[in-house]
C-alpha cells in the first residue's frame, strides 16, 4: 500500500495525469484502502451565511482580577501576561457572538458526518488481556497504573509576576 502512495509524492502530477500507469497505480492504491474515508467528498450547501454575524465589531468583555485568578486556579494556566489575557478576552468575545446566531428550525446533528456511510471494523473477540499493550501508550507508569500530572495543585503566586493592565 505504501508503494502505491509513494508515486504521488515522488512524481509531478502533470506527468502522471492521463497516463495509464497513473490510472493503474491510483486504482491499485484505492483498492488497498481498508476503511471508507470520513471526509465528505462533496461540500454541503449552506442555507445562510453566518460570517456577517461573526464579523460584528468586537466588544471585549471586562474580566476582573478575581475571575482571572479563579480561571488560573481551575485551569492551572498562567494568565498574567497581556497576550494570555487578550487571547482569553478574544475567546470570550467570539463565544458571545456565536450565541447570537439564530438556530431556530435547525435539526440537531448526531455527528458532523451523519450524511456519510461509516464502515465499522470487524468485531474480533480476544482474551481481553491487553493491559501491557494499553500501558505502552502512557508516558509514565507506576506499577500497573497510568501516572497523570496532578490537577489539584494550585499555581503559586510569583513575586515577579506583573499585574494585568486594565
Curated annotation (Swiss-Prot):
Keyword Cell inner membrane: no
Record's signal peptide: none
Enzyme Commission (EC) number: 6.3.5.-
Keywords from the UniProt entry: ATP-binding, Ligase, Mitochondrion, Nucleotide-binding, Protein biosynthesis, Transit peptide
Record: transit peptide: 1-44
Subcellular location, record wording: Mitochondrion
Single GO molecular function: glutaminyl-tRNA synthase (glutamine-hydrolyzing) activity
UniProt xrefs under Pfam families: GatC (PF02686)
Catalytic activity, as annotated: L-glutamyl-tRNA(Gln) + L-glutamine + ATP + H2O = L-glutaminyl-tRNA(Gln) + L-glutamate + ADP + phosphate + H(+)
Assembly: Subunit of the heterotrimeric GatCAB amidotransferase (AdT) complex, composed of A, B and C subunits.
Protein function: Allows the formation of correctly charged Gln-tRNA(Gln) through the transamidation of misacylated Glu-tRNA(Gln) in the mitochondria. The reaction takes place in the presence of glutamine and ATP through an activated gamma-phospho-Glu-tRNA(Gln).
Family: Belongs to the GatC family.
Protein name (record): Glutamyl-tRNA(Gln) amidotransferase subunit C, mitochondrial
